[in-house]
Amino acid sequence: MNRDEFLRRFMLHPAPRIQRPKLHRMHAAVVLILLVEREQELHVVLTQRSKYLRHHAGQISFPGGRQEQHDANLLATALREAHEEIGLAPEDVTIVGQLHDYPVLSNFIVRPFVALIEPQQPFKLDQHEVAEIFTVPLAQVLYQNRHYVYRLRRLLYDQVYFIPYQQRNIWGATAGMLRELADHVYPERQRIYRPLND
């Protein structure tokens, strides 16, 4: 999938109404789903968190984090976090839109922003937070037939998604947000998934 095809499909559908779940003591956070075109194919930018972090160590994630008091709004939070984690300057980011707010078990409600960056964009990792940055062809993670789902009845949400890619396993909130992006871009394929349990 190239840049033009993605933008056409993404813009076909209206932006989601932002509705936060009525849950107490949830903190605002954001992620930036960054897309970059390489050899006429869009890739999604992912990071592997440092194994020394206190929370979610070693997991695959998007750049992002919690909103701070001095942030003007959630988009400002997303741009600040991307700058801190991977050295991405705010002026190098083109925001395309956003997805539904995504609640996670750590008492955060996460707003995913979708954005484009240029192919030659350099990165500078904060080694304390990010062990590695890599890209995955967007088509690989948007095809719902590659998504696995595990159903858990006692969680805030009852489905945990897994998206294997080569030797990596994208799972949890990161996979869930990619699933939402896939459903937004390909609504006709929403019911396709591979269950891990009955």
List the predicted regions and their residue ranges.
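Amphipathic alpha-helical blocks and their helix-capping loop/short-beta junctions
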Residues: 127-157
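Short, solvent-exposed recognition segments
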Residues: 122-126
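N-terminal leader/linker segments that precede catalytic domains of diphosphate-processing enzymes
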Residues: 1-61, 66-120, 130, 151-152, ...
